[in-house]
Amino acid sequence: MNDALRKPSLIRYGFFALPLAFAGLPLYMHMPDLYAREFGLNLAVLGTVLLVIRLIDAVQDPVLGYMSDQYAHHRTTIMYIGTATLALGLAGLCFGPPTTTVTVLWFSGCMVLATTGYSVLTINLNFIGGFWKRDENHRITIASWREAFGLIGLLIAAIVPAVAQTRLTVMQSYMALFIVFGVLMGVGIVLIRNFLATTELETEVGTNQERASFAFLSILTGKDRLFFAICFVSYIAASIPAILVLPFVRDYLDAEAMTGLFLALYFLSGAVFMGFWSKISHRLGPQKTWLVAHLVAILTFVGAAGLGMGDTTGFAIVCVASGMALGADLLFPPALLAAHIRKQNHEATATQYYAALAFLPKAALAIAAGGTFIMLDRVGFTAGASNTELQKTVLLILYAVVPCVLKTVSAGLLWHRMNKKGFKDEAMERDVYHGTTRNS
């Protein structure tokens, strides 16, 4: 690492991903289960509300990215606004509604606020990292620091509620979670403010005219539509178990006390194996390595489908294996997308490419949340209650079998893309990913 990219600057930039990821876990995993269990929110209603909220969250990403480009000179102010919006929404969710008669409206409003703030911060943090340095090796280093801090944030968020609930009530534990978030975000906003005040981005987005062009739909439906389709199917496969992991652990495995341990194993595995996937990609290239990770995920889902009720040891192994696959899913889609942007000389609309990639997991969450909760409600499943063997079997099918099928489809599409595009593109993507290709 040279003097142009020092550790203090990497920490000031990357640390912000820690409180951001910390907030993301309760938003996308804990809160739906909390409101179903503690406030009696009907699963069909919850599924419908989540479907609408996730769609709003997904659709607004390209708009927020476009607006952030137009006010790029006010990036610090944008970060302040995003932080305040996220904090307000998360506080409302963690402290709960003033009365149960407004639970649906309270949950909906707070989720919209929180997810909007989360999107603003995520888009701008990724933009800053992507355009901080021109050098590809530097960009990979920057992304690695950001993702490492993010995984630490996820790990802390997984542990805090479980530890807090050993001494506090469920609601009090989430109040404690918000307090921890406030401390971490306070540190994060100070560091990122200092970073923005002392750091000049080396890479320009393009001319004002290029920035004003709204190319989101043409990006998704253009030459790279097969790549985006692979990502979308893969994200749905990952979203379903992420949404159902809490009821699965509590109502199928009957091991609610071990939830924090399971989540910790998952995120630790993701962090540990990220370096492993990076090394493998040096030999195989990013596409082939991602395909191998697909196979790991498929085998993991097969194993999860065979779990018996109360099989905590087997599920711990599933958590480690699925976390291993998580590292690849975090690493390779952005790396492959960078290769596409560079190959097609589309740097001027790079922000919108990343907005498109950010849109897909949120759209996947919308479909997964709406579909799974509505299906569970159809069979009479009740979160945190005594459910029949049939209802638990449906939960198992949704948690393991459906994602296994989807991941198999995603792997098939990726295999088709590799054969269709040929090994020339694979070599190009490997070179761009590792920073060995330079513009002539």
Give the location of each predicted region.
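Membrane-embedded alpha-helical bundles of multi-pass transporters/translocases
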Residues: 2-435
